[in-house]
């Protein structure tokens, strides 16, 4: 199955009246998203060997919250949705959508917000980004979208991505359309922007017990059935790993068909669990999965592979 976004004027009457039994897509809910992430990162930093880095990530998340409301985006995406729907492509496809200068405006605003909080190497990094030319910044963004991580140092990537993520999340929040599940491929990528997930979440509330993958760029969540590999869609050779016990709130789902894994977070076991924060705070589990010979099928927006990784 794949997910396609349909323009409002192409929806059938039943689709306009009611949601699907299982919502295939949950557009980003930006109100307090970044503040909640920052709070969770600070909470997880206590008694965590990665505490300093989690607090650093919390500073970026808090800055995203401030910049989000200081620099709103106004954009009519109606034509873009129609074109993408006709082509069967993600409407905000990172590989083809022209980037507006708004994202660089967001980056400069993030740097201004973060400067008073930074020191040492981190301060030097954002000052270098502040001095970079428009083209240099665009080249770094293009490299990240192409997964050419050797072209962007791992200390610069989180700041560049934080601005790009804000821009894409703002656009995703403006999409005038509805998602429809259809037969197709590439469910492992975000149906809104084509980026990778950061982790998956088994939710509570109106989507109780359903698994949604969380986009590491536009913050959209999309449904993928449980007990199926989110990367290759096979189901015969799945295994579940945790550092605690079978009731752990965070597990890794590995697949022996493609030798990859993705973390599954369970809200029913910890209602405060957060897709980005808890993924970052559980890197010990990633180390274990690497020892077992599995490759990660996702990327955390605060932790990019460096050159040679």
UniProtKB/Swiss-Prot annotation:
CDD domains: FdhE (cd16341). It holds the Pfam family FdhE_C. It comes from the Bacteria. Keywords: Cytoplasm. InterPro entries: FdhE-like_sf, FdhE_C, FdhE_central, FdhE_N, Formate_DH_accessory. It is found in: Cytoplasm. GO terms for cellular component: cytoplasm; cytosol. One of its GO terms (biological process) is protein maturation. GO terms for molecular function: ferric iron binding; protein homodimerization activity. NCBIfam families: FdhE, PRK03564.1. Belongs to the FdhE family. This is Protein FdhE.
């Amino acid at each position: 199955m794949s997910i396609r976004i349909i323009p409002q004027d192409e929806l059938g009457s039943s689709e306009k009246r009611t949601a699907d039994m299982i919502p295939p897509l949950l557009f980003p809910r930006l109100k307090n998203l970044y503040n909640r992430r920052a709070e969770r990162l600070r909470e997880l930093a206590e008694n965590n060997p990665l505490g300093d880095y989690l607090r650093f990530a919390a500073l970026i998340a808090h800055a995203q919250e401030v910049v989000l409301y200081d620099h709103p985006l106004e954009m009519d995406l109606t034509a873009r949705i129609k074109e993408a729907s006709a082509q069967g492509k993600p409407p905000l496809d990172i590989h083809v959508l022209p980037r507006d200068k708004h994202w660089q405006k967001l980056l400069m605003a993030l740097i201004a917000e973060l400067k008073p909080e930074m020191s040492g190497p981190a301060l030097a990094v954002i000052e270098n980004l502040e001095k970079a030319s428009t083209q240099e910044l665009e080249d770094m963004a293009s490299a990240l979208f192409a997964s050419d991580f050797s072209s962007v140092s791992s200390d610069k990537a989180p700041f560049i991505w934080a601005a790009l993520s804000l821009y894409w999340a703002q656009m995703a929040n403006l999409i005038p359309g509805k998602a429809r599940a259809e037969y197709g491929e590439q469910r492992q990528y975000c149906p809104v922007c084509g980026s990778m997930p950061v982790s998956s979440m088994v939710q509570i509330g109106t989507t109780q017990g359903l698994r949604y993958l969380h986009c590491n760029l536009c913050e959209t969540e999309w449904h993928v059935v449980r007990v199926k590999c989110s990367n290759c869609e096979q189901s015969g050779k799945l295994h579940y790993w945790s550092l605690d016990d079978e009731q752990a709130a965070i597990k890794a789902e590995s697949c022996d068909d493609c030798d990859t894994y993705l973390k599954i977070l369970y809200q029913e076991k910890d209602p405060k669990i957060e897709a980005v924060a808890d993924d970052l705070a559980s890197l010990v589990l990633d180390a274990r999965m690497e020892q077992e010979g599995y490759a990660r099928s996702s990327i955390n927006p605060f932790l990019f592979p460096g050159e040679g990784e």
